[in-house]
């Protein structure tokens, strides 16, 4: 396969470097937030923890403000990353997209099939099929960072690109499968607002303020429309102008991405993790762990992800459609495939959408996500550490 040109600009390279660093550190903060949530939820503080999440402010519970509001900012960040990578970064050509693209597709398909197989015949739990289909980029890069600079940058970029494409798949799934009860007037208002945002982009309006104000309005209309409000963040991101490479110093997209990265990595995602990882383990027995939902989620993440990602990558490389990341080998690629089973943030998020109003099933999702992601993190780091220690 021919070598693809590197179209990343110097500032784009700097942003990628900071991105990997902040996501890795943010992943460690997210781990701490998740652990803190588990401790608090199983301590005398649990009553205050859960009552705070369910308390209402301005018509929405604190939990919904986090899941529908703060996570819209997270999805705005995801959208900016996707647009930057596709236009001028590590996904700028079809050759660069090939390996993470095939791997992401396999990594979404196989976990979903495993979950469906385990929950077949149960319409209530079958709606959670997409829960194990996503990779948590912050958590996965955070675990990978524990190996330090022994990990080739190409592997980190592969994992980041795969997770970004995973997020794109998750956004598509949410839009088509987890939006219901549409309010057509509000949906029409959302489309009109989006059309104005597109017009601003076409008119080459480069000031961020008009986009952000209209983005807030778009979020409100989407929230009221029945489509999940976080999709407003992605739609806004796609309207923010990127500009030409020679204009990168004035690129609104790069400027907004730079300003948002640390807030998202060290505030938004950890707050989400703390609010959603808390589950009381007092009523959970070993028998509950093999209930269809936690079993399907855990096996989908731990088994399905590594099989789907690695098998799709192998087939793509063997067929000459992609190449191994530079400086890596098959075992290292397999180790990264295992780490793709860390599905924390997006898996918990989709779990809330799949089982609205069913706290029991949401708690089972949390248990499955924690077990599957934990096993993937431990197995992946053990394999990669043993492999890198030989070099």
UniProtKB/Swiss-Prot annotation:
Reactions accelerated catalytically: Na(+)(in) + 2 H(+)(out) = Na(+)(out) + 2 H(+)(in)
InterPro entries reported for this sequence: Na/H_antiporter_dom_sf, NhaA
Membrane topology: Multi-pass membrane protein
PANTHER family listed in its UniProt record: NA(+)_H(+) ANTIPORTER NHAA (PTHR30341:SF0), SODIUM ION/PROTON ANTIPORTER NHAA-RELATED (PTHR30341)
Family membership noted in the UniProt record: Belongs to the NhaA Na(+)/H(+) (TC 2.A.33) antiporter family.
Listed HAMAP family: NhaA (MF_01844)
Protein name in UniProt: Na(+)/H(+) antiporter NhaA 2
Source organism per UniProt: Pseudomonas syringae pv. tomato (strain ATCC BAA-871 / DC3000)
Lineage, highest ranks first: Bacteria, Pseudomonadati, Pseudomonadota, Gammaproteobacteria, Pseudomonadales
Gene: nhaA2
């Amino acid at each position: 396969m021919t070598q693809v040109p590197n179209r990343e600009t110097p500032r784009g390279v700097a942003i990628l470097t900071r991105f990997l660093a902040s996501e890795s550190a943010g992943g460690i903060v997210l781990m701490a937030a998740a652990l803190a949530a588990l401790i608090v939820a199983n301590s005398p503080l649990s009553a205050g923890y859960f009552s705070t999440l369910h308390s209402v402010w301005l018509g929405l519970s604190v939990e919904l403000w986090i899941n529908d509001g703060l996570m819209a900012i997270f999805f705005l960040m995801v959208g900016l990353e996707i647009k930057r990578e596709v236009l001028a970064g590590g996904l700028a050509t079809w050759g660069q997209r090939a390996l993470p693209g095939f791997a992401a597709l396999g990594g979404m398909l196989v976990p979903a099939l495993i979950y469906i197989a385990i929950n077949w015949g149960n319409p209530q739990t079958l709606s959670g099929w997409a829960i194990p289909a996503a990779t948590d980029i912050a958590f996965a890069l955070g675990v990978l960072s524990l190996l330090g600079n022994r990990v080739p940058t190409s592997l980190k970029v592969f994992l980041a690109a795969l997770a970004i494409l995973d997020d794109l798949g998750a956004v598509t799934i949410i839009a088509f499968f987890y939006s219901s009860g549409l309010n057509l007037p509000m949906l029409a208002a959302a489309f009109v607002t989006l059309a104005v945002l597109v017009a601003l982009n076409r008119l080459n309006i480069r000031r961020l303020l008009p986009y952000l104000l209209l983005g807030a309005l778009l979020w409100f209309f989407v929230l009221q429309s029945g489509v999940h409000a976080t999709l407003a963040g992605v739609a806004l991101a796609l309207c923010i102008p990127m500009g030409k490479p020679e204009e990168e110093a004035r690129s609104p997209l790069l400027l907004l991405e730079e300003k948002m990265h640390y807030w998202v990595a060290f505030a938004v995602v950890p707050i989400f993790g703390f609010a959603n990882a808390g589950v009381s383990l007092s009523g959970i027995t070993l028998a509950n762990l093999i209930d269809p939902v936690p079993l399907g989620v855990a096996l989908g993440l731990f088994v399905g992800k590594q099989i789907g990602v690695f098998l799709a990558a192998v087939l793509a490389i063997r067929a000459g459609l992609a190449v191994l990341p530079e400086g890596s080998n098959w075992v290292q690629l397999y180790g990264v495939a295992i780490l793709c089973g860390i599905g924390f943030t997006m898996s918990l998020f989709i779990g809330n959408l799949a089982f609205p109003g069913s706290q029991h099933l949401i708690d089972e999702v949390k248990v499955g996500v924690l077990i599957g992601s934990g096993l993937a993190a431990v197995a992946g780091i053990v394999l990669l550490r043993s492999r890198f220690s030989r070099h």
